[in-house]
């Protein structure tokens, strides 16, 4: 949550700092935070609340954070013991697509749980890729995607610097590459920003980039 931005409750959703209040109002929870540590803190709190209020019915956690498949397997076993269902559902697309509801969802889940939550998933993203019931596969594919994206950002920077060193017009280089075999989404988007030097509004954090590369390396 952006601490500097005050979000108010409306007729369509409510804002609260109390996880117990959320727990009593719904059976399905979407987690989208920075890392495994933050995810686990929320999961542990939900398990604790469930034990304290003694509710036996199943709840579903849809985890949209980018985490390692090993962590997913570990947390899934823990949740299963406490009557929670789990959808491994990392997302891709950044802030723009999040606002418009056009994220890509790369998920793995039990078939019945996927079907039960399909309408909700459809509200989050319009590109839903279901990789089957092996929990953790969604996170594996997301890490592969992020690995490729990271390499493309670095190679875009190298290509631009090489062109600059050789005193070649960068706008022309950009146009040529985007219409040639070196084209990529990252070059078209981030490469353009590098050339235009438009860094006023950052689109991602370096810490997230490093985290994603570390997950891929591991």
Where are these regions (language model features)?
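Rossmann-like NAD(P)(H) cofactor-binding subdomain of soluble oxidoreductases
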Residues: 19-24, 28-31, 35-103
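Beta-strand segments within the central parallel beta-sheet cores of soluble alpha/beta enzyme folds
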Residues: 120, 171-179
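Amphipathic alpha-helical segments within well-ordered protein domains
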Residues: 157-161, 174, 195, 214-217
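Active-site-proximal catalytic alpha-helix in oxidoreductases
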Residues: 100-107, 129, 135-166, 176-189
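Interdomain hinge/lid region at the active-site interface
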Residues: 139, 148, 185-218
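Rossmann-fold dinucleotide-binding core
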Residues: 66-146
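Conserved SAM-binding strand-loop segment of SAM-dependent methyltransferases
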Residues: 12-18
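NAD(P)-binding Rossmann-fold cofactor-contacting core
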Residues: 1-11
